[in-house]
Curated annotation (Swiss-Prot):
This is Cyclic GMP-AMP synthase-like protein. GTP binds at residues 165, 212-219. It is an enzyme of class 2 (transferase). Mg(2+) binds at residues 70, 72, 165. It comes from Drosophila melanogaster. Gene3D superfamilies: 1.10.1410.40, 3.30.460.90. One of its GO terms (biological process) is copper ion homeostasis. ATP binds at residues 58, 70-72, 216-219, 237, 252-256.
């Protein structure tokens, strides 16, 4: 069996059946709808401004491995006044609102998160459980309380758990993109929205009012029709997951960003082994340079989310994995050898 077939087999091992995925997804939808309904019940303002949930992360890109037990959701908010994004730099923006008293006035990120935190706490003041239509009873807890970006809900039923990262977001059209360069073609930006999410900008003169751009739908659209791109991303995520302790804070979005920068330059029709070695090699190069440009704003370094020691550890261990991948690819290693790299039992 060729090395390319080994990697294809690994990919199949990392995946789950559509039926199993559907069960988790249905239960997740019931849980998230319950939480939203409870937020509407306890907070009048939330009831008025909530504008729907928008899926993000690996599940939106359809590259989620194993069970769909982690959901990234943008919690869209639409207030009864105009909000305009104004650029700062490095992917950061202010949100200017037309208010009656002061015009314009910036949306205050801390005040926004405090309000949402209070609403969540009202819901979870008492023990929360939900019985799904599949007759499972989940206990719900409110964990990360929006002090970073997300409000996290953990749902547990026996050995089964599902987590939800709910990130407050303001939705904008492509015509409202605040920076000089739009990173995607017009047919994408004109048909899909982007979001502003609460994010602190380090060393900012106005750190309490900064937001950051994100555009998961743009990224999803430009990744379409790229043959093996998504499969390579799945393999990179599987390799990262197998060595997560040795690759601290190396996020799925960082792996995805490595590929986004090579959408047009790489030949995605090549076999999985060749592409995996090439893309993992690019990851190592970025770690060595200690820089990975944000796809939406080149002046922002995505690795800023890691400290220097974490980058050093990631570089050492990613380099070791690259050497092992190269040996497997060039020497025609056995399936057993390749499976070991992914911690997959034979």
């Amino acid at each position: 069996m060729s090395t390319a077939n080994h990697f294809q087999r690994i990919l199949e091992k990392l995946s789950i059946s559509d039926n199993e995925r559907a069960v988790y997804t249905k239960e997740a939808e019931e849980i998230q709808n319950y939480v939203v309904d409870e937020l509407k019940r306890v907070d009048k303002t939330f009831r008025q401004v909530f504008d729907g949930l928008s899926l993000g992360g690996s599940y939106l890109d359809r590259v989620k491995l194993n069970l769909p037990d982690e959901f990234d959701l943008h919690m869209k908010l639409k207030f009864p006044f105009d909000i305009r994004p104004t650029r700062i730099d490095q992917g950061f923006i202010y949100l200017e609102a037309d208010l009656t008293v002061i015009n314009p006035q910036r949306i205050h990120r801390i005040v926004l998160q405090d309000w949402l935190r209070n609403a969540f706490r009202k819901v979870f003041r008492s023990n929360q459980t939900i019985a799904t239509t599949s007759n499972r009873v989940y206990k719900l807890t409110y964990t990360l309380e929006g002090y970073g970006c997300a409000h996290t809900i953990l749902a547990v039923c026996g050995s089964r758990s599902i987590s939800f990262d709910l990130v407050p977001a303001f939705e904008f059209s492509g015509s409202q993109w605040p920076f000089d360069i739009c990173p995607v073609p017009a047919d994408v930006s004109n048909n899909w929205p982007w979001f502003a999410i609460p994010q602190q900008k380090k060393k900012s003169a106005k750190p309490r009012t900064t937001f950051m751009v994100c555009a998961p739908h743009w990224e999803r659209e430009i990744m379409k029709g790229k043959d093996n791109l998504k499969n390579v991303l799945r393999l990179m995520k599987g390799l990262r997951d197998a060595h997560a302790r040795k690759l601290p804070h190396l996020s799925s979005y960082m792996l995805k960003t490595v590929l986004l920068h090579r959408l047009e330059s790489a030949d995605w029709e090549r076999d999985l082994g060749t592409l995996l070695v090439e893309m993992w090699s690019h990851l190592v190069d970025h770690l060595r340079a200690r820089r990975l440009e944000f796809f939406l704003a080149k002046d922002h370094n995505v690795f800023n989310r890691m400290n220097q020691n974490e980058i050093k550890i990631c570089l050492e261990n990613a380099s070791t994995l690259l050497r092992k991948l190269c040996i497997a690819q060039t020497c025609g290693g056995s399936y057993h050898h390749v499976a070991q790299l992914f911690n997959i039992p034979n």
